[in-house]
Amino acid sequence: MTERVRVAITGGSGRMGRTLIEAAKQNDAILLGAAIERAGSTLMGVDAGELAGVGAMNVAITDSLDKAVDDFDVLIDFTSPEASVIHTDWCAKHGKAIVIGTTGFNHAQKEQISAYSEQVPIVMAPNMAVGVNLMWKLLEVAAEVMGHYSDIEIIEGHHRYKKDAPSGTALKMGEVIAETLGRDLEKCAVYGREGITGERDRETIGFATVRAGDIVGEHTALFADIGERLEITHKASSRMTFANGAMRAASWLSAQGSGLYDMQQVLGLKE
């Protein structure tokens, strides 16, 4: 039997953190070695499995990666951009691989993480669902065939608690389409419309955002021409799809050398 990959999960008490703990419990290739919470949390010492509602896992919540340094090989991080950069810095200093599912990074933060990847293996992906990564491949085909003469819009929806907009997945959709069409997304993106906007510029890629209720994640790319339109949609009904993808990424990453990877490489959709 192949040795299981030992993982640590940051933000263990959050919605996504608890789902990641549950996914680790269910995955035969993964062993939860540590669950990290912020300093001062009242959950210190609580069993991570009990916290996630999946039964005891004999892993107590701790407030420091330093305390867990010998307990894991791959860190899984779905926290905040600022925290993720700090955690990646720690991993680079301690020779630990890291899977980053956080979104909302600015350019400077992405550059920092890229620099750390020269020292350790990193998977960084705005969405780890298998279906979403397949969708990005489909968007390449759609953009090649219809993109030059269609109006392109990206519509995304998430729960009321999501802090960044548009979502990282929506931005990646725009990047895939823009790159396929030879455009610069920073120059052609339009984020929301209001007032008298004038006739639509055919070279633009529009973004619309919904934040409501408990929507886990819905993304649609619209290619609209006169007389027909194509819609490519992905809907997530559970955070578990992201968590399972993160476990798959951690297992794959444990066998890689230093470098910055994405989920499409994990899934074998690109080299």
Curated annotation (Swiss-Prot):
It catalyses: (S)-2,3,4,5-tetrahydrodipicolinate + NAD(+) + H2O = (2S,4S)-4-hydroxy-2,3,4,5-tetrahydrodipicolinate + NADH + H(+); (S)-2,3,4,5-tetrahydrodipicolinate + NADP(+) + H2O = (2S,4S)-4-hydroxy-2,3,4,5-tetrahydrodipicolinate + NADPH + H(+). It is found in: Cytoplasm. NAD(+) binds at residues 11-16, 37, 101-103, 125-128. InterPro entries: DapB_C, DapB_N, DapB_N_CS, DHDPR_bac, NAD(P)-bd_dom_sf. Pfam families: DapB_C, DapB_N. SUPFAM superfamilies: Glyceraldehyde-3-phosphate dehydrogenase-like, C-terminal domain (SSF55347), NAD(P)-binding Rossmann-fold domains (SSF51735). Keywords: Amino-acid biosynthesis, Cytoplasm, Diaminopimelate biosynthesis, Lysine biosynthesis, NAD, NADP, Oxidoreductase. NADP(+) binds at residue 38. (S)-2,3,4,5-tetrahydrodipicolinate binds at residues 159, 168-169. Its EC number is 1.17.1.8. Its main location: cytoplasm. Belongs to the DapB family. This is 4-hydroxy-tetrahydrodipicolinate reductase. It comes from Shewanella piezotolerans (strain WP3 / JCM 13877).
